[in-house]
From Swiss-Prot:
UniProtKB keywords: ATP-binding, Chaperone, Nucleotide-binding, Phosphoprotein, Stress response
Bias-annotated ranges (Basic and acidic residues): 481-505, 605-614
Gene this chain is encoded by: dnaK
Name this protein carries in UniProt: Chaperone protein DnaK
GO molecular function, one term: ATP-dependent protein folding chaperone
Biased composition (Low complexity): 577-597
Pfam families reported in the protein's UniProt record: HSP70
Amino acid sequence: MSKVIGIDLGTTNSAVAVLEGKEPKIITNPEGNRTTPSVVAFKDGEIQVGEVAKRQAITNPNTIVSIKRHMGEADYKVKVGDKSYTPQEISAFILQYIKKFSEDYLGEEVKDAVITVPAYFNDAQRQATKDAGKIAGLNVQRIINEPTASALAYGLDKDDDDEKVLVYDLGGGTFDVSVLQLGDGVFQVLSTNGDTHLGGDDFDNRIMDWLIKNFKDENGVDLSKDKMAMQRLKDASEKAKKDLSGVSSTHISLPFISAGESGPLHLEADLTRAKFDELTNDLVEKTKIPFDNALKDAGLTVNDIDKVILNGGSTRIPAVQKAVKEWAGKEPDHSINPDEAVALGAAIQGGVISGDVKDIVLLDVTPLSLGIETMGGVFTKLIDRNTTIPTSKSQIFSTAADNQPAVDVHVLQGERPMAADDKTLGRFELTDIPPAPRGVPQIQVTFDIDKNGIVNVSAKDMGTGKEQKITIKSSSGLSDEEIKRMQKDAEEHAEEDKKRKDEADLRNEVDQLIFTTEKTLKETKGKVSDEDTKKVQEALDDLKKAQKDNNLDEMKEKKDALSKAAQDLAVKLYQQNGGAQGAAGQAGPQGGNPNDGNNGGAQDGEFHKVDPNK
């Protein structure tokens, strides 16, 4: 089996790793960075991903950031020109880019991947992530939870007795807490809890809001109405947040941010760590509820926890580290890089799948309860949250009315007692139930959750044996036809990108050849015959014309012709120079001898120091 890469598809940044030998290794992107911004931009018909997309976000309105926050939303679309893109398609552009530079690094085609998701992602969000992988041309071998992946990275080389580990994962846009038990190569998730709409972006926004308010109070100008100013504020806020992880105060300077009646306006502000902590205190406190719930669901207290692992770039915020230390009663473990741990863990799981890693078993859980709607709009659970997956559970239900010919199976995910308050995953009908009094027919409903957390549901009439099955696609799931269409679009974009790169390479080669040929003609003037230089000059003029006409086919043809003519000229020049040197060699005091090694030919020989006084 070929290499299985591990991808941390993050809200703000993504990372990819692969198992080399027994160790997972981060694959750097073309810029040499170990993480890649999860940013996609559309510019002049070209799709840009990563650093280049993020850099021009200020000037390009067709730039998409934090798309992960919208995974699983059925009606969410990104409109670019006259075309709309789903979150799955935007994510696929990021995955496609990661796939490409991973292939460049490995020197082979990458087909298989393990992709991570926040532990608290529901079925719709997981399915959307898997669909994004398919669109990007990846066979998604496994979807695993981010905290579980970081625990794999932490625990790979640990041979200690059983450890209970709490993973506090605060990323760019999502937050999870998971409790795991590690021992003898078994990584068992005991519980998970979180908030899929809380992360570092929210901390950035607090700084932005503070800057906007202060600027409005001082200058009477509302920067929130200015899109370009907002992008500059966003970048400055993110930088200030990062700075305050290392220093107690930072200066924010944004010259010419706006203009007033008296001329240009500049934003200058000093932000202390104390003020930042004050602005974001409620966000930090908001993470305490999932922290407590994860411990409660695992049946543990903080005293039972052996290690606390911090994961996600936002855990570098000092107030976050301080809070976790206070809540857990112990110093968090800093042995793994919070930006890279998830990708490294995903690569380890990839190694398990490919057979390169032995003696590791990953037992994950479903984050939310699953069940169906029953009479009175009640949500009846079949599988409780934090159940180890894969799993299967069946329960017998019956009809609610006499002679009821069909039952509507409404599949839900959540924790609320009433169906209306929970998340609909899908619904289907079991029809042709024979007439019978209410409560007599026996309908067996079975839930299956696979290793990726994807749900399959079936309903079977025990009397007739008739059965109806569905794989829950959820309201946001894509059909096979839609995925195939999007795969084709992605492939076409890849072909377009290659064509565009080939064109750019050709133009660069033409420019370089014209420059070097003109230089050569100047340098060889008078050294070779006019007839020889005329051929090169004509070929040069032909290429310049093709370049001016922007005719790519002609440019390629004329480039090859000029290359040949220039090469012929270089050969003649070399022969003339060689001949001159040969003649000079024969003009020695002894007249030369064909066997004395001075005949101008290249042959083996010994070199001796010559004494000029002899």
